[in-house]
Structure formats: structure tokens, C-alpha cells
Amino acid sequence: PISNMEEVLEEENVTFFAPTNWSIRKSVALLNKMWYQMGNDSIKNLKQIKPSVWREYLSMYILKDKYTLKDIPQIDTTAIAAYPGQTFITYGGLPMNVGVVYGDANGVKYVGPRQILYSYIYDITVSDLKNAYVATSDIQPKNGVVHVLRMTDHDFGFDRRLFALKAIEEGIDELSQINKTE
């Protein structure tokens, strides 16, 4: 198990904002670049990254309980005082803002398509948010709901540099160590 979170995702009632493989690849690519610049061989297996790192970063995307699009309040980033969305605490204890963006249609405000905006509250003192839009919402497995994040503009962990630094700080396992345990 890469993160030791299988039980949470399979058994508990949760909402999972699923990052795409592409966003994970981008973050790991930066980690590989930094790791290589430090004189180390490239990471060839995701299991070389400690489970504690995967757990910390995957926890950013998991909320306790089930929240479908209809359960989430409106957010308007241009009128945040009126439509702020809602702050939730992730499985890992971080504050995240979640809101539904109501699009405009034919010049009429808020009657168009709706899209969930999942935002990491980077600095709560200045309301600094790192946003991730949902591409597909309300996938409902047996124990919760999954919202898949857009791949084009999201980095795993909301900041791939911080992910890379955390992985380096925790230590990268040698590939030979991983192969012995498999």
C-alpha cells in the first residue's frame, strides 16, 4: 500500500476530491528533478516515496462524510462576502474551502452550469487560496462520493514544490529496498 489509506477510502463515509494521475506525475517529475540535482538516481517506483508523505498529501483531498454538489454552498470569487462557500477540515486536519461556482447563461447571473471549486487555504490570515476546479462530480461508490479534479491546472498537493521538499525531507527509499519487500 502506497499510503496506508486504503481502509479510509474503502470503508469510511468520505468525500474524495480525486487528483488525476497527470497532477501526481507533474509533482513527482519536479521531485525527480530536485532529487537528481542533489546527485541521486531518479525515482522509478512511487513506493520509494514514504507512505507518510502520500498519507499527508492524499489527506488534503479527503473530507469526512458525504458531500454531493447539491450539499455544497455557492461560492463567487468576485463576491466572496456574499457567497463564500464553506470551510471544511480535511482528514489530515487542514482547512479547505469548498463552494459551487454558478455560471452565467445568456447574460443572466448564476443560472448557468455549476462547478465545484476545491480550495486549499494556504494562509488563513489573508484568505490566500490555491484553487482546483472539479471536472466530474458526484461519482458515488458504496461509501461516499468522488469528485475528480481537473487535470490541466492542478498540481498534486496544491504546490508541487512543497510536495517534493516534503518527500526529500522524509527520505527516498532505494529502489533495491522496494524490490526486496515486494
Regions found by a protein language model. Give the residues of each.
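Mature, structured domains of secreted/extracytosolic soluble proteins
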Residues: 1-182
